Amino acid sequence: MKDVVIVDCIRTPMGRSKGGAFRNVRAEDLSAHLMKSILLRNPNLDPNEIEDIYWGCVQQTLEQGFNIARNAALLAGIPKQVGAVTVNRLCGSSMQALHDASRAIQVGDGDIFIIGGVEHMGHVPMSHGVDFHPGMAKSVAKASGMMGLTAEMLGKLHGISRQQQDEFAARSHRRAHAATVEGRFAKEIVGLEGHDASGARFFYDYDEVIRPETTVETLSQLRPVFDPVNGTVTAGTSSALSDGAAAMLVMSADRAKALGLTPRAKIRAMAVAGCDAAIMGYGPVPATQKALKRAGLTIGDIDLFELNEAFAAQSLPCVKDLGLQDVVDEKVNLNGGAIALGHPLGCSGARISTTLLNLMEEKDATLGVATMCIGLGQGIATVFERV
């Protein structure tokens, strides 16, 4: 099989979904901006050589409907003969897009792909039009479709306290703010125009979602939001609602070499796994274990991890059962995570992978894992190796 390499990876700033920077910017525009930008950053690449575009998006309706991948590609001026398809594995959609492109390259069905994803949660809410089949209640707990309650369940099963959740969430904001101030996100963010609070046009090249003032003390004052009587999960310990997109240029190693493009990493292994929908946030554990087995690696071999922070109550059990609790500050989400940056559903897989690759370069790390939970009980993971 052909080796699959990542040549480039970028993302938009993360905008707040409620009246945020991108309230007047459509999801197709966020996507097209990155498609154009990744080509501008790699002038050796002839766009006519692109085989296909795989683009993750969860809520495929309204402006995100009718194959947003193709709509964005047309807006971006991608040659008309290049295909584009929208991919949906809920929270893992853009990582699934990466996996799909990687497999196509491995079996010889193309050498050059753009992958990524988008979600404008301000324009298309997560629950818009959702209508679960009532018969699912025969085999799946009714609350399984309510992500916050699945986090409550997972946290209770693993004895995760409110204090632990508040500390983890404060850490996310603290580290994300430090990464912003120190310019560590500059290599991955491709800024674009939005609107400030007054409605004036403003060029955003930073994440609007981060709240640097967040502390354990302020978080401790928030009430549980999903289970007000007995719960511990608050809005502050949940991933923020945000708008954003991320993209990667994925190629066969041979074609990258022929074009004189320097790979940043290669795909070492990929995996998805299922788990009980009632504890959907546990998915990263079996997915990561499966990916590592395929790569012939152990947890101890991995230098850095990016674990999508859907909830603190969900992340901490995964950290514990992956055996990472003693190395969190050395290996896990060193630039914060979705609690601070937000979790635009279709974007997040490519976003955490992009952040991971930049951290691996910064830390001169060799091996990294990006993994995330997926609604209704799945996990997805990718093992990257720097080249």
Swiss-Prot record:
Q: Which SUPFAM superfamilies match?
A: Thiolase-like
Just give the chief location class.
Answer: cytoplasm
Known InterPro entries for this protein?
FadA, Thiolase, Thiolase-like, Thiolase-like_sf_Thiolase, Thiolase_acyl_enz_int_AS, Thiolase_AS, Thiolase_C, Thiolase_CS
Q: Name one GO molecular function term.
A: acetyl-CoA C-acyltransferase activity
**The UniProt record lists the keyword Acyltransferase:** yes
Give compartment(s).
Cytoplasm
One Gene Ontology term of the biological-process aspect is: fatty acid beta-oxidation
Pathway as given in its UniProt record: Lipid metabolism; fatty acid beta-oxidation
Q: Which CDD domains match?
A: thiolase
Record EC number: 2.3.1.16
One Gene Ontology cellular component term attached to this UniProt record is: cytoplasm
Membrane-spanning intervals of the chain: none
Q: What does the record give as the reaction this protein catalyses?
A: an acyl-CoA + acetyl-CoA = a 3-oxoacyl-CoA + CoA
Q: Where is the active site?
A: C91 (acyl-thioester intermediate), H343 (proton acceptor), C373 (proton acceptor)
Q: Does the keyword Lipid metabolism apply?
A: yes
**Keyword terms, alphabetized:** Acyltransferase, Cytoplasm, Fatty acid metabolism, Lipid degradation, Lipid metabolism, Transferase
Which PANTHER family does its entry note?
3-KETOACYL-COA THIOLASE FADA (PTHR43853:SF11), 3-KETOACYL-COA THIOLASE, PEROXISOMAL (PTHR43853)
Q: What does this protein do?
A: Catalyzes the final step of fatty acid oxidation in which acetyl-CoA is released and the CoA ester of a fatty acid two carbons shorter is formed.
- Give the quaternary structure: Heterotetramer of two alpha chains (FadB) and two beta chains (FadA).
The family annotation for this protein states: Belongs to the thiolase-like superfamily. Thiolase family.
* Record's protein name: 3-ketoacyl-CoA thiolase
The beginning of the lineage is:
Bacteria, Pseudomonadati, Pseudomonadota, Gammaproteobacteria, Aeromonadales
